[in-house]
């Protein structure tokens, strides 16, 4: 079982309380000391869009000596170039079967996003790319994606990166939803992970979803420090 810790990025990017660069570096160091060997440490997005991630270059420089895998989110070519300039080697991208999500977060439709990522990641080793599939189990606006469309999308994701992460972005998936999507992965060659959000109205159910993932052979799960 592997844990991929996303707290310094996903946990902090929308937090009401902004941590200083020094506090982020300390957090990442403590996570490393606790035994976590895969940590997402920042997001190279435009600082006006996500102010809490504006210091990602500085954070990465300070933690780059840690003996663990350090991942960073890079939604576009500019972000990738910034990440490379400070020595980042592991790059995380995101997209969704939900076109509403794609337009709101990446400013393009799914077809264009795939094209942009293929161009942007040319020359980056596939094993260094992690692909987040947001709203993989359904979008609160658009509902569920039909299985044929989702299967084709997941196949394209598996071509982009060596690790594809299925995200229950709003924490509403149940065990049947999990099984329906995980069934699609059996014929697609990739390393699959799960990113399950906590929903306080059904907090006990998340462990049922973890068990389903484990039963389907998932051995890497995202976590986020509270």
Predicted regions, residues:
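Glycine-rich, proline-tolerant flexible connector loops at the mouths of alpha/beta enzymes
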Residues: 37-63, 95-109, 135-142, 165-175, ...
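Conserved N-terminal beta1-alpha1 strand-loop-helix module at the mouth
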Residues: 1-44, 50-67, 159
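Non-cysteine beta-strand/loop elements that form the S-adenosyl-L-methionine
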Residues: 4-6, 89-98, 130-134, 217-226
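Catalytic alpha/beta core domains of metabolic enzymes, predominantly
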Residues: 167-226
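Alpha-helix-loop-beta-strand connector modules within alpha/beta enzyme cores
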Residues: 49-72, 111-130, 156-157, 178-194
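Active-site mouth loops of central-metabolism enzymes
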Residues: 4-25, 68-77, 102-107, 135-148, ...
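Conserved anion-binding
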Residues: 97-167
């Amino acid at each position: 079982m592997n844990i991929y810790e996303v707290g310094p990025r996903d946990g902090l990017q929308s937090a009401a309380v902004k941590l200083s660069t020094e506090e982020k570096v300390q957090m990442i160091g403590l996570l490393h000391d606790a035994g976590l060997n895969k940590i997402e440490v920042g997001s190279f997005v435009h600082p006006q869009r996500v102010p809490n991630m504006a210091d990602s270059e500085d954070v990465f420089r300070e933690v780059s000596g840690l003996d663990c895998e350090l991942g960073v989110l890079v939604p576009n070519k500019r972000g990738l170039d910034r990440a490379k300039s400070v020595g980042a080697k592991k790059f995380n991208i995101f997209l969704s079967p939900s076109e509403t999500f794609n337009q709101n977060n990446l400013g393009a439709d799914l077809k264009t996003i795939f094209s942009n990522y293929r161009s942007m990641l040319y020359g980056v080793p596939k094993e260094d790319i992690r692909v987040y599939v947001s709203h993989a189990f359904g979008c609160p606006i658009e509902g569920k994606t039909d299985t044929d469309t989702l299967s084709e999308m997941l196949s394209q994701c598996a071509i982009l990166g060596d690790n594809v992460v299925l995200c229950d972005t709003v924490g509403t998936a149940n065990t049947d939803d999990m099984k329906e999507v995980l069934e699609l992965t059996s014929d697609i060659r990739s390393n699959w992970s799960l990113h399950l959000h906590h929903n306080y109205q059904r907090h006990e159910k998340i462990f049922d979803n973890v068990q389903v993932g484990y039963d389907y052979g998932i051995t890497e799960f995202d976590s986020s420090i509270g």
